[in-house]
Amino acid sequence: MAVLECEGLRKAYTGFELGELDLSLTEGRVLGLLGPNGSGKTTLIKLINGLIRPDGGRVAVCGLEPGPASRSLVSYMPERMQLPDWMRVGGLVRFYEDFYRDFEPQRARKLLSSLGVDEGLRVKQLSRGLRQKTQLVLAMSRRARLYLLDEPFGGVDPASRDYILETIMAGRAEGSALLISTHLISDAEGLLDDVLFLSEGKALLSGEAEQLRRERGMSIDALFREVFRC
């Protein structure tokens, strides 16, 4: 079953256009949304989550157009910090428990502890890396149908990335799908079932990760560097 479908999706800003994008993501799959800064990755994620309206085309989550019903099925981790500075981490867990019916507080507390995040600290007392870990834990502690993670490894020390990868893989609800936007491709490559390369709002390359590795004779990370000449 398709958890996410985009057909001819368009969004234009001054000097930029996300154009005629087609995408399908089915249950159990992880899609890597890959591209340089300014390629349209965050714009696409916001369209999927219903935070901005498309100028054309269609997007659906489990057959639902963006709106309150579809957003209840989506767990979204934005690239930029969205947590209020004055709240304590434990308070955030209680807030999510009250706000989301599918949130699992015991799981969140266990993950926070294993990642070294003190629930008694206020958000403003956390380092950038600890804030990122907290956002990720909150997102992955929901039993969502679709997880949208925008640069989940930003600000996280390399030593913690393997554990975070394990958290992402183990935390997904059964029957869910995951879309992950990242520029740290070598770290995330083991997660990815499918990839979509974006450049200036256009899809340059897409397909199953394993098939692309076989056809091109290189890793997805190496292919990314070749396509974008990094």
Which residue ranges define each predicted feature?
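Conserved beta-strand
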Residues: 6-9, 16-26, 57
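The feature captures the beta-strand-to-loop junction immediately N-terminal to the Walker
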Residues: 34-36
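Helix-to-loop junction immediately C-terminal to a conserved catalytic motif
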Residues: 49
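Conserved ABC transporter NBD signature motif
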Residues: 56-70
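ABC-family P-loop ATPase nucleotide-binding domains
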Residues: 79-134
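Catalytic Walker B motif of ABC-type/P-loop ATPase nucleotide-binding domains
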Residues: 147-151
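Helix N-cap at the start of a conserved alpha-helix in ABC-type nucleotide-binding domains
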Residues: 158-160
